[in-house]
UniProtKB/Swiss-Prot annotation:
Pathway assigned to this chain's UniProt record: Cell wall biogenesis; peptidoglycan biosynthesis
Species this chain originates from: Bacillus velezensis (strain DSM 23117 / BGSC 10A6 / LMG 26770 / FZB42)
Family: Belongs to the MurCDEF family.
Keyword line: ATP-binding, Cell cycle, Cell division, Cell shape, Cell wall biogenesis/degradation, Cytoplasm, Ligase, Nucleotide-binding, Peptidoglycan synthesis
GO molecular function annotations of the record: ATP binding; UDP-N-acetylmuramate-L-alanine ligase activity
Name of the protein in question: UDP-N-acetylmuramate--L-alanine ligase
Keyword Cell division: yes
Domain of life of the source: Bacteria
Sections of the chain in a coiled coil: none
EC number(s) stated in the UniProt entry for this protein: 6.3.2.8
Listed PANTHER family: UDP-N-ACETYLMURAMATE--L-ALANINE LIGASE (PTHR43445:SF3), UDP-N-ACETYLMURAMATE--L-ALANINE LIGASE-RELATED (PTHR43445)
Localisation: Cytoplasm
Amino acid sequence: MTVYHFVGIKGTGMSPLAQILHDTGYQVQGSDIEKQIFTQAALEKRNIPIYPFSADNIKPGLTVIAGNAFPDSHPEIAKALAEGIPVIRYHKFLAEYMKKYTSVAVTGAHGKTSTTGLLAHVMQQAKPTSFLIGDGTGRGNESSEYFVFEACEYRRHFLSYQPDYAIMTNIDFDHPDYFANIDDVFDAFQNMALQVNKGIIACGDDEYLPKIHANVPVVYYGTGEENDFQARNIVKNTEGTTFDVFVRNTFYDTFYIPAYGHHNVLNSLAVIALCHYEEIDVNMIKLGLESFGGVKRRFNEKVIGSQVLIDDYAHHPTEIKVTIEAARQKYPEREIIAVFQPHTFTRTQSFLDEFAESLSAADRVYLCDIFGSARENVGKLTITDLQEKIANAELIEENDTSVLKAHEGAVLIFMGAGDIQKYMRAYENVIA
């Protein structure tokens, strides 16, 4: 049997795919940078070998699965190609692998990871389900009927897939280094819709998704009356959220989620709609929703002394807005502090005013230096350009986070898609 070698095994898609193959009996190994990344814990738990990048890793008998971030000139990929060792790109391999299951793609500008995690958790209550979540979590089950996976629109990667179902959470302008404008983003989702084989579950409250055309049924969810699945009588409190679901204006059931913010009602509705479509028992759905513990880097809380520290992946103005709203729902009496690290110069430049507006919903804002991606690293913009647009915003350094101690009893939300976690760890060390 071949050994699958992952070039870039710590990637947020690559790591869960390696976990899935391992769980279903394949021999797996991989290589990556030596820096500790949150996606590697699950690999280490399974004793999957992780090597530093080196052409010496490439040997006969391997099948190389190459991460999208690495060109054919990468030493390992180049050697494999030169020696006739099979090389398959991540999305091509995944597209072929999922064909043996009923596949569900979860896509959208925001909410992909949380919705994928929730759907996988709920479906597992009823049927064996394999899943690939963009927080680095994957699980394979040889007897699975379903394969639930996160599908990203960036560089139109999701057009590699032809899933049975697709959940579309929303369409928004992001990834300005690739997409020209919102119409370009819509075009990508429209093309994706035409590749779905059985049905699409889409948010009808979204500005753009109702304009999608497809060759399969499109079921809409949301709070608007025109939706097929509608949430009514939404009650939000410090313990979570309760709401009634009506299916085409007929009462279906009442649901409770231990989650906060309107976006989590919509994510739950998407899951309820798909499970209803697949005739999964409503009690199984309710059990799954009520017992879901969340996904990595999405509103992950830690209480230290009088403060609540929250780690969140929010890196777009829309995501920052809903994360702060969720914190206010759960902690209405507390001061909300935003500690934000912008991710990529292009995104920061494109949404400078929107970032300022979203962050201003917090009671106080602290800003970290811009995290440049591997694709750019430098830009003319600096963090002070954002600071100047936010009243009383302060800059914060990893080696000097002690200023946060002044906010006794506050909720501190550390937000970003880069290495914002190192700032949170640094602060934890200060107050330990």
